Amino acid sequence: MLCVLAAMVVLALSALTFNRNVIRDAVDSEKQSAQSQADWEQMLGEEAVPDEEEEPYFDDDGQREISCWGDSMIEGDGADIAFIETPDGVKDISYYTAPYTLQEMTGIRTYNFGVGGAASDEISIRAGGLVLYTDRDVYINNKKATRVALVDGSGNRINMSDYYGYGGEDNDMPDAFYINGYLCTIKPIWNSDEVKLKLYKEPGTKGRQYAFIPRDSEVTPKAAADHSQDIMILEMGSNGGWQSDYDILIMQYLSIIQEHNCSKYIIVGDTDDPGTSLGDINQDVVNDDGSYIGTGETMWETALHDAFGDHFINMRVYMLENGLEDCGFTMTEQDREDYERGIISSQLRSDWTHFNSYGYYAKGKGLYLKGVELGYWE
């Protein structure tokens, strides 16, 4: 009996000691947590104030500017030395791109946001159509980058060579984005599906600033925010990104147009020869009945024409019917044969898919005339 009582006393004392240790550990943990939070806040520095997005660009007369979004065909890959005859004499169009030609003909500042090799989903992201989100809660500061992943609406991680949208345009704020009103920089991490995120450090800023970015915060490229009110020239799909599903491609176009509530836009048809586009596996070099496409519409062109009506320009057909004349070229026998097949003259190309400066000049003129037709400029 005495042994049992002794054992019970030992157990009681042990329990009391255990409870005291638990309470002490909990108190110590709470103190440590409070201290850690204080240290964290001290380390972070001053809390940043959200930035106001810049007003969209207009010129001195209140004229909307023009932004051209696309891949290498907007960027101007293949542009080279070129001269054309005009009523005023020889004109040097060396290294002209379609956006530059459009700017010259309209007198309106035109931005070239083309990125070589960009797929349609990437172009839509850069233009502010398809929205990206942060995948976790993070504190960020303006001194040291924090890792985070960017995901689409389905939670899939998105990995791009660059996200910010300016392409080859001069820009004194590279890699800039708005996240929850904060101006941030995002840079890819080599061989990773995460990116480096930090607050943009304004010139003259002293000390460390920080901000809390909650999970599922929208990520908006600064280029898309700055140019949300521009007249938009949109060309995409040649490099894939839409699974050769015309409905997906149309949705990507619409995501840009609807996000910016844009009523002034031009959808540019693909200029690869029929059956040669890497993005469209549906189209063959001939129609189902074996006839050549010629100046008729491919399935891709029909899908975009049906979806966007007069906003669509069939650039392949424009180049077939006007490209050589725009540059003062004479049609060769080979050009005539290619015309019947729907193939753009090699005199306008630098390779099988890209134009040279003659081709880009003619393309820019086609965009100019389309804008006149739609009443965007005179």
Model-predicted segments: where are they?
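N-terminal, intrinsically disordered, polar/charged segments of Gram-positive cell-envelope systems
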Residues: 23-64
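Residue-level recognition of beta-strand->loop/alpha-helix junctions
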Residues: 112-115, 269
